[in-house]
Amino acid sequence: MDAADLREYIEFEEGEVVRKTVFETERLWAQTVCLDRNGSYGPVSDRAADALLTILAGEAVFVIDKKRKRLKQWGATVVPAAAELVITNASTEPLVVLMVVAPPPPAETD
């Protein structure tokens, strides 16, 4: 059984989005997305996968296919397959989002 202390996957770099893979299997992928103040991530989409986003720390504005929702810590939302996603930090505090995607996206190539 795999287990993780999510605190080990939290890291911030000024002006950067820091993403760290927590788990990856054939059917599921989980990562943290860390945004400093005024940070944003996206737009991104995956035609074949749904995603569950949970705020672990901070406050975010999620724009999913041009629909806007503001959520605080412990808030969660679903991003349907093929939907475009943008995440924006909505507070002066750092933002940490746990993103769980199924099925996992194709491997990134350089």
Model-inferred region functions:
Residues 1-29, 42-43, 77, 108-110:
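A short, N-terminal "cap"/entry segment at the start of jelly-roll beta-barrel domains
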Residues 40, 47-49, 63-65:
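Compact, glycine-rich, soluble single-domain proteins
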Residues 59-61, 68, 84, 94:
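Structural motif
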Residues 81-106:
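Ligand-binding loop in jelly-roll beta-barrel domains
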